A protein has these predicted regions:
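Bacterial N-terminal signal peptides
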Residues: 10-20
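TPR alpha-solenoid repeat register
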Residues: 276, 310-311
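Canonical tetratricopeptide repeat
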Residues: 279, 313-314
Length: 338
């Protein structure tokens, strides 16, 4: 007997005939996790960046649906999701197989293809999508120049066309355009069950062989009443941290004026972020601009006293001058001095 908390299993029972195991194949107890959702895979023609973004009424959609590899492509695998489409699709595209042919091969080999929904885009911007005939309605996809949008278990069939139009008309970088697409899908009705999690991943158009440097953005909202809005907040915060990173890079190049501009931009984006204020101050102190740094140290100390305690520990790591007179002036801006 199905318990009330197991009612989500009911749709899976309809697909029991698909689960017969062929000789030599391992058993798959269900045709995949029921990650019914809407998503987009896309490429930025200006930068070559490739990405995927998704929202679902399913906990922690990020590890399941969106996949991307720099210089290779991106995949969204959903409906009764077979996660293998992600890594296997990327592996084929990495060997030079175009997205349409890669998807064709994987779909042909999948006995449960009728309940799958998958989209792929390769580094050249070629796209392909598959919506199985037994995906829960409303289900469908739309492809265009450098993108594919796909959705299933939607309120109605207007969701994915709305996503497509939004992506095509949106301004901004790839993250912004994909967010606009998700927002349009939700505004058009979205998942009939509601919403729970979201994710976005973007990689560079050319791989360096160092994946940790090639992943531009990977953000996830695991469980939230408005996951797209929360994802947008995280993207905004990511942009602020990128300003901080740019400031640090400018400091390394001894371009203090550029660093100040970047640090100031980050602080303006997220007022009250003591982390930004403190490291801005520390960078100025390192470059001999202590008079400018002291008010910033004071702000950081008032916001979070832990920064005051951290100051004496930093000279040994080269993050503040190893000069007792300078440290005394910095600490004088703290709560103990007040």
């Amino acid at each position: 007997m199905i318990r009330p908390d197991q009612r989500w299993l009911l749709p899976l029972l309809a697909f029991a005939p698909l689960l017969a195991v062929s000789p030599g194949r391992s058993a798959e107890p269900i045709p995949g996790r029921p990650v019914h959702t809407f998503s987009i895979v896309a490429r930025d023609p200006a930068t070559g960046a490739i990405g995927a973004a998704v929202q679902s009424h399913w906990f922690s959609v990020g590890p399941l649906v969106p996949w991307a590899e720099a210089g290779v492509g991106a995949v969204a695998t959903q409906s009764f999701v077979r996660v293998d489409y992600g890594p296997e699709g990327l592996a084929l595209m990495k060997k030079g197989v175009g997205a349409p042919e890669a998807l064709r091969r994987l779909v042909a080999a999948d006995e449960a293809r009728d309940v799958r929904q998958v989209a792929m885009i390769d580094a050249r911007g070629r796209v392909a999508a598959h919506t199985g005939g037994r995906c829960i309605r409303a289900a469908g996809h739309e492809t265009g120049a450098g993108y594919s949008v796909q959705a299933n278990l939607m309120v109605d069939a207007g969701v994915w066309p709305a996503m497509a139009r939004a992506f095509e008309t949106a301004q901004g970088d790839l993250a912004e355009r994909m967010l606009r697409s998700l927002e349009a899908g939700q505004a058009a009705g979205g998942d009939i069950r509601g919403r729970q999690s979201a994710a976005i991943v973007i990689v560079k158009g050319k791989g360096s062989g160092r994946p940790w440097n090639d992943r531009i953005m990977e953000l996830r909202v695991e469980d939230h009443p408005d996951p797209i809005a929360e994802l947008r907040r995280l993207v905004f915060l990511w942009r602020a941290y990128e300003e901080m990173n740019a400031g640090d890079l400018a400091i390394e190049k001894n371009d203090v004026e550029a660093a100040v501009r970047h640090y100031g931009a980050a602080e303006a984006m997220v007022p009250g972020m003591d982390e930004f204020v403190f490291w801005h101050a520390a960078a100025l102190a390192q470059k001999g601009r202590l008079d400018e740094a002291l008010p910033l140290f004071g702000r950081a100390f008032r916001q979070q006293p832990g920064w005051y305690l951290l100051v004496p520990r930093l000279p040994a790591s080269g993050l503040l001058p190893d000069d007792p007179a300078i440290l005394k002036r910095i600490l004088a801006a703290g709560p103990a001095a007040e």
